[in-house]
Amino acid sequence: MKSSCTINTKIVDIVLIGGGLMSATLGTYLQLLEPNWTIHMYERLENTAEESSNGWNNAGTGHAAFCELNYTPIQQNGSIDISKAILINESFEISRQFWSYLVKNNLLTNPQSFINNMPHINFVWGDENTRFLYQRFKALQCCTIFNGMEYSENHQQISEWAPLIMAGRNTYQKVAATRMLMGTDVNFGELTQQLLNSLQRNPQFHLYMKTDVVDIKRNNDNTWTIYTLNSKDSYSNTEVRSRYVFIGCGGRSLQLLQQSGLNEANNYAGFPVGGKFLVTNNPTIIKDHNAKVYGKAKIGAPPISVPHLDARILNGQKMLFFGPFATFSSKFLKYGSYLDFFQSITFKNMLPMLYVGKNNFNLVKYLISQLIMSETDRLDALCEYYPKASLKDWKIIQAGQRVQVIQKDKKTGGILQFGTKVIYSQDRTLSTLLGASPGASTAAYIMLELLDVMFKQYITSESWQRKLKEIIPSYGQILNGNLSLTNQIRSYTCEVLNLNYIKAMPS
């Protein structure tokens, strides 16, 4: 095997590691704000958006907190905490504004190729769960951004909303559902490809495929040297220096953070969890289900286990997914290495991992129960949401890998975090995105927050402020509680993205 080394002496403005939605979103922001900046993006696979950004690999495809019950947990005092749901919905509204600006300026095309109306429905059964859902519904009534949510315990009404989940169900079963017609389905793979196509129109943007980042080192002048290995070009090595670095390569981000030598890396470990889905494209079944139906995780199960019967539109074709069923692999990426997990273990993060294992026995038990599931077990789980389901209509697929963040904690030794977290170097020139859900849906918000931290000296400038307010009309404002602004923003994004607009009314 031949190998050569090329050293790029010119300092680039920013290196983006990973060819997924997060890097594409950050690159798009920066190209709009500083079109003359040099941006290098490195993707280790042959194609971009092949990991978690891919529509087949997402755990969920339209997180807006309308129907994800794990974002509204019950507090010890019995009340419902809606703070996370509010944040996620506000974040998704920023994503919609970001995409709308790009469509208006012909940087994204044919919005129906990546976003479509899809009602978001919650469905539960049993006295305790129906009480919880009603309590959640009432708690969200005070929120402008959840205006329009409907609640029903009527079998006939719920059957009209989602026929599949009610056909064949015991008519005496206690059930409840909520519905948000404002819900959407998003194809993040298509969205990522379009963002990258747009970025490549600028000669200052350089995309390197089949190029693996193997090391990151800080230089004395506070720049960074990125070492890459290109498997397409006789395994040639390249070194490039950059003022800024963003590590957004999914599960592999933790390993590169560790290689960067940052002290911040010592506070984190990762636990890989995969997922499988039952999928059907049977037109007879699909025509009767036009919604994303989310249930409630069973007692003792972790938040990542929320089951859903999820209509998705992939490459113009409607599909129906049910799951997820948890899987375990030591890979940090779907197309990663079985050594990923073991290579990420250090003397400094080993103890937090052990503490998390000890303190999260329910998670361990849940994973074991998922791993030993038979086809019949999976069908039984599906029949709870689709009573007339037959296994012959469904196939099982392996979805993507996610790496849950484990963080050192003085009190408990280690905490398993469900969500995304951005880690920064002390001088804010390098950042890393760790974690998973809600991820893609809130990408525009997460990257906007990242701009505020990494580019503090730029974001306060008049030119950046003016441009950001042009891209995100609600920039610097909160929608929730502001009925006029909520309607103004939603009316605008619905018109541009060809979505149905439902006006929020006074409570």
Curated annotation (Swiss-Prot):
The keyword Oxidoreductase applies. Coiled coil: none annotated. The keyword Flavoprotein applies. Signal peptide: none annotated. SUPFAM superfamilies: FAD/NAD(P)-binding domain. GO terms for molecular function: 2-hydroxyglutarate dehydrogenase activity; L-malate dehydrogenase (quinone) activity. NCBIfam families: mal_quin_oxido (TIGR01320), PRK05257.1-1 (NF003603), PRK05257.1-4 (NF003605), PRK05257.2-1 (NF003606), PRK05257.3-2 (NF003611), PRK13339.1 (NF009875). Keywords: FAD, Flavoprotein, Oxidoreductase, Tricarboxylic acid cycle. Belongs to the MQO family. Its EC number is 1.1.5.4. Pathway: Carbohydrate metabolism; tricarboxylic acid cycle; oxaloacetate from (S)-malate (quinone route): step 1/1. This is Probable malate:quinone oxidoreductase. It holds the Pfam family Mqo. InterPro entries: FAD/NAD-bd_sf (IPR036188), MQO (IPR006231). Its cofactor is FAD. It comes from the Bacteria. One of its GO terms (biological process) is tricarboxylic acid cycle. It catalyses: (S)-malate + a quinone = a quinol + oxaloacetate.
